[in-house]
Amino acid sequence: MKEFKCELHIVGGALTGLLTAYCASQLNYKIIISEKKKIISNQKKAISDKRTTAIAEGSKVFLESQGLWQYIKEFAEPIHNIKVIDKTAKSKLFFSNPKENSNLGYIVKNSKLIEVLIRLLKKKKNISIIEGAGISSINSNNSKILSFSKNEKISSDMIIAADGKNSAVRKILGTNVFKKHYREKALVINFYHEKPHKNIAYEFFFKTGPLAILPMQKNKNNFQSALIWSNNPQSVDMIASTELQKKYVTEILNEKIQQYLGRITNINSIQTFPLSAHINEKFYHDRAVYIGDAAHSIHPIAGQGWNLGLRDIKSLMNMLKRSKNTKTQIGSIKFCKAYNDLCFYDAYRLFEITDKLDWIFKNDQHYLKFVKKLGFNIIEKNKTLKNQIVNFAMGI
């Protein structure tokens, strides 16, 4: 069995794990990334992810502070405005950044983010990557935490669990988790359309569920957007599995969005994902902390899932930086509890907000239609309230 030693053992080599490793490497920690799949060496697999990530303005500021935005910005399509249209209550809202010449956020392909991070991580001398290493057991004592896979033993000061919704670390350590299954699936489509999107993001609320359209970069001379549509599993499966898939999807979507973007000219990709949310009872264990989807996931209705995970990373980096400067012990119970206190309630609040928003906008009861219409009118006319919502969406 091979033995490895490091200060930080990051379990999970997807987007959150890679970003955490890069940021921690800037603080000169010795790091090991372990990943059960061969995502990093097999870049073809990494770039096959057709999904997009919405990066809020506040998240962009953090990425700038880490020296990362300079590599990402060429792939990022800005969001200038957001239009919210509730089809059940026939109400509309229009949001823009109150600061002149500023954006609300950016849309970037996951594959581009991963590509950039892998390229930068390969240049780091204080990062080692172990692939094909699924964690099978974990033991800890007062000063170290040991993790074991089939062929490796890794000794570290702290484990950072970034291994997603179905975290193996969480399961092994026995951290309790609350799960919410929405009995919905998300239909994720990248498509080309006739008219320019003018950097406007749309959020439609239908009785069946929300539909978001996000502006993407032009591909050559083709206008392109990403669509995320939450619907019941039967409808999503029927749309995604039909033999005349692209033609059928095009017909359905043209009915809903043609007046905004013109006709759909081509469907680039179609993917489906079951919708669920979860939150851990706590975001730490003995010498281990959970970040991103290993700690929490939320309904995509507000497009804030990845930004919430990035706030975990930001909080953890501030603590690691402080520990480096004061020479305090990382991974101690005091350290891990302090991280939990910084991140848990922020995540719990957003978990509850997105869950309630989903319920409100899916509910077709008459009194709720009235409440939604009234709420939309109040927000549209109240500049202060509108700006507060914009700041929340931007993560500032």
PLM-predicted stretches and their roles:
Residues K282-I301:
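Short FAD-binding loop at a beta-strand-to-alpha-helix junction that anchors the flavin cofactor
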Residues H9-V11, S25-R51:
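Glycine-rich FAD pyrophosphate-binding loop
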Residues G58, N166-A201, N231-S235:
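Central beta-strand plus flanking loop segment that forms part of the substrate or channel wall
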Residues I47-E74:
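N-terminal glycine-rich dinucleotide-binding loop that anchors FAD/FMN and/or NAD(P) in oxidoreductases
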Residues E3-F4, V61-S65, F75-I172, K180-K185:
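Conserved N-terminal helical subregion
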Residues N318-I396:
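C-terminal helical "tail/cap" subdomain of flavin- and related membrane-associated enzymes
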Residues K207-F273:
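Conserved FAD/dinucleotide-binding core of flavoprotein oxidoreductases
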Residues M1-T16, I32:
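Beta1/beta-strand and adjacent pyrophosphate-binding region of the FAD-binding site
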